[in-house]
Amino acid sequence: MVKMSKKVAVGLSGGVDSSVAAYLLKEKGYDLIGITMKVSCDLDVSEDAKKVADKLGIPYYVIDLTEEFKNKVIDNFAEEYLQGRTPNPCAVCNKHIKFGALIQKAKELGADYIATGHYARIEEHNGRFLVLNAKDDKKDQTYMFYSLTQDVLKHILMPCGEYTKDQIREIAKKIGLEVHNKKESMDICFIPDNDHGKYIKGLECRDRIKPGNFVDKDGKILGTHKGLIYYTIGQRKGLGLSLGKPGFVIDINPERNEVVIGDEEEIFNEGLIAKEVNFIPFDSLENPMEVEAKIRYSTTKSKATIIPYDDGKIKVMFKDKQRAITKGQRVVFYIQDMLVGGGTIESIVK
């Protein structure tokens, strides 16, 4: 349990969740400071966040992490697409920025802990910090926290995890926060129009975007694609092909600059290999384990077995074939409401 005398830096985004998180902690008597991370010259949420800090009567700081965000998140985002993978920038940001660089900056301001408005619960059991599903299943964000280590988890508070979204909005309205009915942001924060292709074309790496061939699984040329960054596994729309039947992206080959097209049944696979794996309740996987797994943020959990593999990687075998397992995305594991861990999808087991 956190001692009330400890200083807590609350990450204020200007939205309702982080604002109410700050209010809930202030009501419990914590010594708070509000901080907003600046990650883009074009993205400024500090005005709403400053209003919330003033309303709650807490000190407020803007932390400039623009350079760190570019180096860790944006560059990785572009490189993954250029390599034919589909990145998850939010997972990268959580690991390196929100719960990496931001924690370090908060410590420099004298804070012992950082709090956010995320929907997840962190509890200590027998000296180990566990991540549990939020009370609001529809808003649960635990998928994004699989990579957090024990050293990081012990410094994080997530009060919104004990409430539903409707309850959070009601609290905000009750205490007079202007953001109580603010619309949620669903897109990638640094790509507000959700057009990642246009965004990457505006970066220095634009010259690496090259047209290439659409091919079938036998290598027969079907047409010309605009560049690997525009395609992802399972994609059907926007291919510009006339095949006489529906065609789906079943593979992307960066070495040959080819996008492989096939039938829908070919995007269903039974397993995957994951790298960069992290576990939360324990340090490493020694034996096969039955879990429920998610291969992207928006999917439901599916029964699977995780198996130790070479070089710290793991094999994940699903009870039922999964649609569009995608390299670069994250696979995350659960046992009931406990987050077990996860990793980056490296390859597909067919």
Swiss-Prot record:
UniProt KW keywords: ATP-binding, Cytoplasm, Disulfide bond, Nucleotide-binding, RNA-binding, Transferase, tRNA processing, tRNA-binding
Enzyme class: transferase
Site (Interaction with tRNA) location in chain: 118, 329
Gene Ontology BP annotations: tRNA wobble position uridine thiolation
Family: Belongs to the MnmA/TRMU family.
UniProt EC number: 2.8.1.13
Organism of origin: Clostridium novyi (strain NT)
Summary of the function given for this chain in its UniProt record: Catalyzes the 2-thiolation of uridine at the wobble position (U34) of tRNA, leading to the formation of s(2)U34.
Highest taxon of source: Bacteria
PANTHER family in the record: MITOCHONDRIAL TRNA-SPECIFIC 2-THIOURIDYLASE 1, TRNA 5-METHYLAMINOMETHYL-2-THIOURIDYLATE -METHYLTRANSFERASE
Disulfide bonds: 93-189
Binding positions (ATP): 11-18, 37, 117
Annotated protein name in UniProt: tRNA-specific 2-thiouridylase MnmA
Chief place where the protein resides: cytoplasm
Listed GO MF terms: ATP binding; tRNA binding; tRNA-uridine 2-sulfurtransferase activity
Catalytic reactions on record: S-sulfanyl-L-cysteinyl-[protein] + uridine(34) in tRNA + AH2 + ATP = 2-thiouridine(34) in tRNA + L-cysteinyl-[protein] + A + AMP + diphosphate + H(+)
SUPFAM superfamilies: Adenine nucleotide alpha hydrolases-like
Annotated stretches, region: Interaction with tRNA: 139-141, 296-297
Subcellular location: Cytoplasm
Residues annotated as catalytic: 93 (nucleophile), 189 (cysteine persulfide intermediate)
Coiled coil ranges: none
Record's GO cellular component terms: cytoplasm
InterPro entries with a match to the protein in the record: MnmA-like, MnmA-like_C, MnmA-like_central, MnmA-like_central_sf, Rossmann-like_a/b/a_fold
Pfam families xref list: tRNA_Me_trans, tRNA_Me_trans_C, tRNA_Me_trans_M
